[in-house]
UniProtKB/Swiss-Prot annotation:
Glycans are attached at residue 73. PANTHER family: PROTEIN SUR7, SUR7 FAMILY PROTEIN FMP45. This is SUR7 family protein FMP45. It is a multi-pass membrane protein. Involved in sporulation and affects the sphingolipid composition of the plasma membrane. Present with 329 molecules/cell in log phase SD medium. GO terms for biological process: ascospore formation; cortical actin cytoskeleton organization; endocytosis; fungal-type cell wall organization; septin cytoskeleton organization. The gene is FMP45. Residues 1-5, 138-140, 210-309 are cytoplasmic. It comes from the Eukaryota.
Length: 309
């Protein structure tokens, strides 16, 4: 039991870590300075795309030109800013054909990936409460809820990772095929795939914890039920016997037990009050000593022998 609690607390830290990494991913592009400027999805050479900067970085909320380690000429911020060079800079003869012909592919992959990222963070936050309580509370519903929320969070985080990876890896390949430099943002992709790994471990352990917790609770219930079936409890016949043989009185005489169906009842005879003839006969009857009995011819006792003075 101690080992299970230790592992559950350790995996709970994994859940916290996944939530923290996902939160940083959502903040990508929230500011144009500081640490957040290094959390980008793709950096590529966009020179010649109409009025686009020579080097562009794409974030969650906008895209910015990158020169001499600083961001400049950023676009307006908007949630789930789509990755689509055709929409970002307009159509151009220098724009690779894949961005013109497959515009919807890049557009919806980036936007749906953002939505899946938000949903995964929502389920991660929900899983924190039962994940912590499952270590200390014996209720069966808590580990089951923890397991369900963990698998939902894992499903949406891996879906977001696949959508983002598919979108920007395809874009990097398109840029490089056109003779332009392009690279993925190392921090963003490291964070999102690390979150996938942490949530996978969390989901697997929550399933094991829920299954073992349920089996232990079932065994305890069986033991509790067995106590009620213990032979130490008096049976109905024993209770009837003890009640019948009881000598307790209520002040007016002995308590008579209720008759039991199917059991022969003892019969008693009573002598009417004031009738003393029975006791008078007992007084006049004389018991004859055994020494005064005369032996019979057949070895028995013939009867009393009269002794005369």
């Amino acid at each position: 039991m101690i080992f299970k609690r230790f592992v559950n607390l350790l995996v709970f830290l994994f859940l916290l870590g996944a939530g923290l990494l996902t939160f940083f991913l959502i903040l990508s592009g929230g500011r144009e300075s500081g640490t957040l400027k290094n959390f980008y999805w793709l950096q590529a050479d966009t020179n010649g795309f109409n009025s686009a900067p020579s080097t562009t970085r794409w974030y969650n909320y906008n895209w910015c030109g990158y020169e001499d380690g600083q961001l400049a000429n950023c676009s307006s911020r908007a949630p789930a800013k789509p990755f689509s060079p055709r929409d970002n800079f307009g159509n151009s003869v220098n724009l690779p054909s894949s961005f013109r012909n497959n515009r919807d592919t890049y557009y919806y992959l980036s936007r749906v990936g953002w939505a899946m990222l938000l949903i995964s963070l929502f389920f991660i936050v929900l899983a924190l409460v039962p994940g912590f309580l499952a270590t200390f509370l014996p209720f069966k519903a808590v580990p089951v809820l923890y397991c369900v929320l963990s698998w939902l969070a894992f499903f949406f985080i891996i879906l977001a990772a696949c959508l983002y990876t598919g979108c920007y890896v395809k874009a990097r390949k398109t840029f490089r095929n056109s003779g332009r430099s392009a690279r993925l943002g190392p921090k963003n992709f490291a964070f999102i795939w690390t979150s996938v790994f942490l949530m996978l471990v969390n989901a697997i352990w929550s399933t094991i914890f829920s299954a073992t917790h349920k089996a232990h609770s079932t065994y305890s219930d069986h033991d509790m039920y067995a106590q009620y079936e213990s032979p130490s409890v008096d049976t109905g016949a024993q209770m009837e016997k003890s009640t019948y043989n009881s000598g307790a009185t209520d002040g007016a005489g002995p308590i008579t037990a209720a008759p039991v169906v199917g059991q022969p009842q003892p019969t008693t005879t009573t002598t009417p009050a004031g009738n003393g003839k029975f006791f008078q006969k007992l007084k006049t009857r004389k018991q004859v000593p055994s020494a005064e009995l005369e032996p019979a011819g057949d070895g028995g006792l013939a009867g009393p022998v009269t002794v005369r003075d």
